């Protein structure tokens, strides 16, 4: 598969991560990665709404 990551590649990456960090730290890494993705999505949605001038329902209620 050109330009994509298939199942064999994902398995190899997972094995390498297990070797480097160990099974005990995987939950910590997963939680940190999840928080990072959540913050990234929140920041991008805030930037998009600021660029288009849209207001979120929470922002409209705060100004009342």
From Swiss-Prot:
The chain crosses the membrane at residues 1-21. Keywords: Cell inner membrane, Cell membrane, Membrane, Protein transport, Translocation, Transmembrane, Transmembrane helix, Transport. One of its GO terms (molecular function) is protein transmembrane transporter activity. Its main location: membrane. GO terms for cellular component: TAT protein transport complex. It is a single-pass membrane protein. It holds the Pfam family TatA_B_E. Gene3D superfamilies: 1.20.5.3310. Belongs to the TatA/E family. Part of the twin-arginine translocation (Tat) system that transports large folded proteins containing a characteristic twin-arginine motif in their signal peptide across membranes. TatA could form the protein-conducting channel of the Tat system. This is Sec-independent protein translocase protein TatA. The gene is tatA.
């Amino acid at each position: 598969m050109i330009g994509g990551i298939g199942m064999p590649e994902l398995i190899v990456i997972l094995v390498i991560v297990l070797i480097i960090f160990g099974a005990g730290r995987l939950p910590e890494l997963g939680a940190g990665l999840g928080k990072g993705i959540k913050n990234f999505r929140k920041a991008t949605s805030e930037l998009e709404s600021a660029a288009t001038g849209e207001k979120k329902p929470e922002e409209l209620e705060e100004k009342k």
